[in-house]
Design a protein with these regions (language model features):
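Conserved Class I S-adenosyl-L-methionine-dependent methyltransferase catalytic core
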Residues: 1-48
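Structural motif corresponding to the C-terminal cap of alpha-helices
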Residues: 12, 35-43, 68-72, 95, ...
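Class I S-adenosyl-L-methionine
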Residues: 14, 83-180
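Phosphate/oxyanion-binding active-site loops and adjacent basic polyanion-contact surfaces
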Residues: 23-30, 56-60, 83-87
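Conserved class I S-adenosyl-L-methionine
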Residues: 46-56
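Phosphate-coordination loops involved in phosphoryl transfer and adenosine-cofactor binding
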Residues: 47, 75, 119
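Conserved SAM-binding loop of SAM-dependent methyltransferases across substrates and taxa
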Residues: 57-73
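Conserved SAM-binding motif I beta-strand of class I
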Residues: 75-82
Length: 180
């Protein structure tokens, strides 16, 4: 088993994926495939700084650190940023627990973040509403070599979706959410 995946509730102590977290596990692994594809863009001879904006519970943040540092041997400094203080505290606790000295989490708004002067890679995975826009702007401002972004646009679309023909379906919240 991968210890951080156990603590984050994705895997059990026997190393099996929790059924309800299978989609999350697949999502993490797919994103790591993207990272594998861009490895030639990252300088393995120097520290690589990566920001994960809107990191949430940090499934991906921990996976990136583990993959890049433990499996691929990169000297990475990874920063996760999110609005939720309780989640950030938990993530920092796990980073300490595993001795991940160059993995840090901060509470804050992406639009106001000024914690670094340059980055090598900016990551956003389902950062909600305008968070992705701010993250992309920051990445460009810093001249990031790599930007990996999978926006979370369903919330924005959900508010705007209107269609008379589909109204019988859209009146049900769960179906409207799935449609968006």
């Amino acid at each position: 088993p991968v210890p951080f995946l156990v603590d984050l509730g994705v895997m059990n102590k026997e190393g099996r994926i929790i059924t309800q977290k299978y989609d999350k596990f697949r999502q993490i692994n797919r994103f790591l495939e993207f990272i594998q594809d861009i490895l030639p863009k990252l300088d393995q001879q120097k520290e690589v700084t990566i920001l994960d904006f809107g990191c949430g519970k940090s499934y991906l943040t921990f996976a990136m650190y583990y993959y890049l540092r433990e499996l691929k041997g990169y000297d990475v400094n990874i920063i996760g940023l999110d609005l939720k203080t309780d989640v950030i505290e938990k993530c920092n606790g796990l980073a300490v627990k595993y001795g991940y000295e160059k993995l840090h989490f901060y509470q804050g708004d992406i639009a106001d973040y000024e914690g670094v002067s340059s980055v090598d890679m900016v990551v956003t995975l389902h950062a909600c509403d305008t968070a992705t826009d701010y993250a992309l702007a920051k990445a460009v401002e810093w001249g990031a070599k790599v930007i990996l972004s999978v926006p979370c646009c369903q919330h924005e679309v959900n508010r705007q979706i209107k269609n008379d023909t589909l109204e019988p379906i859209l009146k049900y919240g769960i179906l409207k959410e799935r449609m968006s």
